Amino acid sequence: MSDLPFTLDQLRILKAIAVEGSFKRAADSLYVSQPAVSLQVQNLERQLDVPLFDRGGRRAQLTEAGHLLLSYGEKILSLCQETCRAIEDLQNLQGGTLIVGASQTTGTYLLPKMIGMFRQKYPDVAVQLHVHSTRRTAWSVANGQVDLAIIGGEIPGELTESLEIIPYAEDELALILPVFHPFTKLDTIQKEDLYKLQFITLDSQSTIRKVIDQVLSRSEIDTRRFKIEMELNSIEAIKNAVQSGLGAAFVSTSAIAKELQMGVLHCTPIDGVVIKRTLWLIFNPNRYRSKAAEAFSQEILPQFATPDWNQDVLKLAQKKLVVNVLDAAIPNTSDDG
């Protein structure tokens, strides 16, 4: 066989159909017509002389041959992208793309600052930030879809041997209260006082929720006795709920700097209890590491990796920047997303 029986465009179409589950949605995602997608698949099947999809059901299902081609096709597309990016790097950071992955908290509150600093130094390098769950982010690194990532959760066990995993920083979780709550007048909250609070939490399967339960359990605090007022799916929603007086919550200190400065949330330590988790920097050591990724990891990341990076936020509470609404009005706030 002198010529390849497929093109890169056909591999992209095959991958899109597998991801989207239908020819129409695949066509929409690729900004082409559905007939064009169908024609390319027909040509591909004719060239290979084998069906790639089982068209009997409502969802486009890959045949065994389709799965095999997709497996190799994804590797081919990934290598093509690596090749293009390696050539771009020859321009000495005068172009190219840096793709950074992050779990929810780090992607929302930490990475934007880092990327801002990087863009100031290398304005010609495009930066993409992909924020997903810890598991999905780790797989994105393993598959070569992102250059590096900072995550705060548990890395899937099946990936620990294939990734370069570096302890990056400690993320401290703090108890936040509405500024008009009686406990805000206390220097510290006793363990037994936690059972008197109503809590706003992430769902029970979230990484942060599990860390909180584990640490408090080691401090002989039974979170099963907590009064859960509601479960929400984002840190921003939790902060807004606490600010509105609906309950208390545990959140990363990196997520509350703005609110502490503005005096719309209160942070009080728990006597004898510190809740911390490790943030991990992960690479794929078997993938080409771009000059942009090297510059980001060597020049930007160290500035945020100091052991006490959370303490700068906690000092805001110690400086009495939080104002009780009984004494002063709360300033207007806006959602920073």
UniProtKB/Swiss-Prot annotation:
Residues 6-63 form the HTH lysR-type domain. The keyword Transcription regulation applies. Coiled coil: none annotated. Gene3D superfamilies: 3.40.190.290, Winged helix-like DNA-binding domain superfamily/Winged helix DNA-binding domain. InterPro entries: LysR_subst-bd, Tscrpt_reg_HTH_LysR, WH-like_DNA-bd_sf, WH_DNA-bd_sf. GO terms for molecular function: DNA-binding transcription factor activity; transcription cis-regulatory region binding. CDD domains: PBP2_CysL_like. Keywords: DNA-binding, Transcription, Transcription regulation. Residues 23-42 bind DNA. The keyword Transcription applies. Trans-acting transcriptional regulator of RuBisCO genes (rbcL and rbcS) expression. Belongs to the LysR transcriptional regulatory family. This is Probable RuBisCO transcriptional regulator. It comes from Nostoc sp. (strain PCC 7120 / SAG 25.82 / UTEX 2576). The lineage of its organism: Bacteria, Bacillati, Cyanobacteriota, Cyanophyceae, Nostocales. The gene is rbcR.
